[in-house]
Amino acid sequence: MASLVAGIDEVGRGCIAGPVIAAAVIFAPGQDTHGLADSKRLRPDRRLVLAGRICSESLAWAVGRAEVSEIDQLNILRATHLAMCRAVAALPVLPDWVRVDGNRYPPLDCPGEAIVGGDASVAEIAAASILAKVFRDREMEVLDRLCPGYALGVHKGYPTRLHIDRLASRGASFFHRRSFAPVRAVIDRSSAS
């Protein structure tokens, strides 16, 4: 088995606002990874503690992103793979093997595998899911302060009832993904008026 294994995961794929963020994490062989879990199963305060530990104790970590304009231009799958490739390219050490959460392997220059449910079963992927979630949530909270009225700090860009209601009453903003159906519907309604 390869000695340096990177885990990759993304956050924001199902959102209708904001970027998609991917993280890549490499642990030193034999490193203690106790307590890591899929970011969706952790309380926000626990995610923050673990993210700090991952950043300080992992052999290497990096974050990549795809902007709203890239998501709208490429489609969400290709934009997600772009964010993943950017995360791996930003690593200060290149991995020998990559494990990606999901069912499709991105076009990386290193070998690896896609693992469905990897965020719950592979420590490196769980760590990447935690970093990606913490980084994206922080960005959405900053965006909420810069553009109040959409409650981005609450729903983080996901298509919740609150977000859809705010989108309908306020219209789409620069951070909304125009290629996504709920946003497109609001734009179409406002242009028909």
UniProtKB/Swiss-Prot annotation:
MF terms (GO), sorted A to Z: manganese ion binding; RNA binding; RNA-DNA hybrid ribonuclease activity
Cofactor mode of binding and number, as noted: Manganese or magnesium. Binds 1 divalent metal ion per monomer in the absence of substrate. May bind a second metal ion after substrate binding.
Catalysis: reaction(s): Endonucleolytic cleavage to 5'-phosphomonoester
Pfam families in alphabetical order: RNase_HII
Function of the molecule: Endonuclease that specifically degrades the RNA of RNA-DNA hybrids.
Organism, as annotated: Methylococcus capsulatus (strain ATCC 33009 / NCIMB 11132 / Bath)
Protein name per the record: Ribonuclease HII
Needed co-factor(s): Mn(2+); Mg(2+)
Keywords, in A-Z order: Cytoplasm, Endonuclease, Hydrolase, Manganese, Metal-binding, Nuclease
Family: Belongs to the RNase HII family.
Enzyme class at the top of the EC tree: hydrolase
